[in-house]
UniProtKB/Swiss-Prot annotation:
This is Jacalin-related lectin 36. The keyword Amino-acid biosynthesis does not apply. Residues 1-131, 145-289, 313-457 form the Jacalin-type lectin domain. CDD domains: Jacalin. Residues 34-57, 133-162, 291-334 are annotated as: Disordered. Belongs to the jacalin lectin family. The lineage of its organism: Eukaryota, Viridiplantae, Streptophyta, Embryophyta, Tracheophyta. Residues 133-143 have a biased composition (Low complexity). InterPro entries: Jacalin-like_lectin_dom, Jacalin-like_lectin_dom_plant, Jacalin-like_lectin_dom_sf. The gene is JAL36.
Length: 460
């Protein structure tokens, strides 16, 4: 029995922002987002196994839609769609057939909305036309932004998130050969928007969160030519912020290394790139002049963070091996939870949960989890606080530089068990009359090399 068909109409809008389709033999569903629409996204149909789509930059609009269709059973179905904008062409997404139709916007008009008929497949599609968006409707962020070319391979389908006010979170998914999936959470005009590209795997996605008073200044992109691929693919991404905070490397080392960075030292406010099949081929970025928000204090070195709880905080030097990528959670109001993961050689992973305005604030993951679940040290916050950290470190065969082998935490009430094994060297991180309110250090791909702390005077 054929599925019931339903007519739908998204109406006319200021501009199309994003189109996403899912498909198998034919298109199963279509989803669209529009500028200035409070009901985003508009979804029609049932999900298919494959997904593709396009995100338009703020100064980009659709001028043409080309469709391919076929007859399945007693009904026609759209098998593929392609989109042409004032900048480039996207698609076809789906499976091309011999039957083709095209819709072209009249002069000085754009395609600003979709309508059609759907069942469990997309049966037909039509459009609404509207005058071209005025230049003033494009984001002021975009007009000031510098677009840095995408680095990596030349293949894949282009996507462009455009420029925003801030980048708040980055999600990275990995597969056997490289980076398969990226998702970015932006802030624009005090509203949150997210864009995703590629395909998640069973491994899920790792997260890099940017503090409210911080911003990304550069991205290290590594790429390589992988067997079975026609072009280079992205194998690893590392993000750096204005506070000297580094993400762990998301992925594996590649033969080519690039840096996405603004020559004028601007803040990263958007991404663009190319994705092909199940791998990310290239990544580029938009940079805008940095405002006061997220800029390091003139009296504070760039390597130290300044979250809300930073008043009166002091940064104690990290101890351990002098290799790996720096990371810094910055000072907070207190520490609520500690998570320690161990590997064959030493401490492989740390994560700290802090307090801000009596709410839990998770820090970023540092290092890499192993099959052994992380151990947890819970504090009876706010009555309990950490006063010192004992760390052991050693040079282990096969590792680059010394690594942390053990951590032990002392509070105003008790001492934790040792997390790890004794090392050749031991050091105590402590400042008399102070409590620990944050952590920093250095980490490799799957090991912790250094740990340091932020401290604040204990209030009476």
């Amino acid at each position: 029995m054929a599925a019931a068909t339903m007519s739908w109409d998204d109406g006319k809008h200021m501009k199309v922002k994003r189109v996403q389709i899912t498909y198998e033999d034919v298109i199963n569903s279509i989803e669209a987002e529009y500028d200035g629409d409070t009901h985003n996204p508009h979804h029609h149909g049932t999900p298919g196994k494959k997904s593709d789509g396009v995100s338009l930059s703020p100064d980009e609009y659709i001028t043409d839609v080309t469709g391919y269709y076929k007859t399945t059973g007693a009904e026609d179905a759209i098998a593929a769609l392609a989109f042409k904008t004032n900048k480039t062409e996207y698609g076809p997404y789906g499976n091309k057939t011999r039957n083709q139709f095209s819709i072209h916007a009249p002069k000085d008009n754009q395609i600003a909305g979709f309508q059609g008929i759907s069942s469990n497949v997309l049966n037909s599609i039509d459009v609404h036309f509207a005058p071209l968006p005025s230049s003033s409707s494009s984001s002021s962020s975009l007009s000031q932004a510098n677009k840095v070319d995408a680095q990596g391979g030349k293949g894949g389908t282009s996507w462009d998130d455009g420029a925003h006010d801030h980048v708040r979170r980055v999600y990275i998914g990995q597969g056997d050969s490289g980076v398969t999936y990226v998702k970015f959470e932006y802030e624009k005009d005090d509203k949150k928007e997210s864009r995703e590209h590629g395909k998640k795997t069973l491994l899920g996605a790792e997260v890099f969160e940017v503090d409210p008073d911080d911003y990304i200044t550069s991205v290290e992109v590594q790429s390589d030519r992988i067997f079975g691929q026609d072009t280079e693919v992205i194998t690893s991404l590392i993000f750096k912020t204005s506070k000297g905070k580094f993400s762990p490397p998301f992925g594996l080392e590649g033969s080519q290394k690039y840096e996405l960075k603004d020559k004028n030292g601007g803040k990263l406010v958007g991404f663009h790139g190319r994705v092909g099949g199940e791998l990310l081929n290239a990544l580029g970025a938009y940079f805008a002049p940095s405002s006061g928000r997220g800029t390091p204090s003139a009296t504070q070195p760039p390597g130290s963070a300044q979250p809300t709880g930073s008043a009166g905080a002091k940064k104690l030097e990290a101890k351990g091996g002098n290799v790996g990528n720096p990371w810094d959670d910055g000072p907070h109001e207190g520490v609520r939870k500690v998570y320690i993961g161990q590997g064959d050689s030493g401490v492989s992973y740390v994560k700290f949960v802090y307090d801000k305005d009596s709410k839990e604030v998770p820090g970023n993951d540092h290092g890499k989890r192993t099959l052994l679940a992380p151990e947890e040290f819970l504090l009876e916050y706010p009555n309990e606080y950490i006063t010192s950290v004992e760390l052991n470190y050693d040079k282990i065969f096969g590792t680059e530089g010394e690594i942390i082998t053990m951590l032990r935490f002392t509070t105003n009430k008790r001492t934790s068990p040792p997390f790890g094994l004794e090392g050749a060297k031991s050091v105590l991180l402590k400042e008399d009359g102070h409590k620990i309110v944050g952590f920093h250090g250095k980490a490799g791909a799957d090991i912790i090399h250094q740990v340091g702390v932020h401290v604040k005077p204990i209030s009476k």
